């Protein structure tokens, strides 16, 4: 069984004509997967493309 770690991902995403800040807690195996999962969540929930999401930091909790 693979151990999942908690990561805190901070950044901003394009909401209309403005940028909105966000902080998300993501369960993932590593930092790269946490970043990809964040892009995926914003794409599915907010309909934004990866280029409209700017991740500023990823830290293990």
Curated annotation (Swiss-Prot):
InterPro entries with a match to the protein in the record: Ribosomal_eL20, Ribosomal_eL20_dom
Q: Which SUPFAM superfamilies match?
A: RplX-like
Q: Name one GO biological process term.
A: translation
**In terms of domain of life, where is this protein from?**
Archaea
User: In the UniProt record, which is one GO cellular component term?
Assistant: ribonucleoprotein complex
Molecular function terms in GO for this entry? large ribosomal subunit rRNA binding; structural constituent of ribosome
Assembly and interaction partners: Part of the 50S ribosomal subunit. Binds 23S rRNA.
Q: What is the protein name stated in its UniProt record?
A: Large ribosomal subunit protein eL20
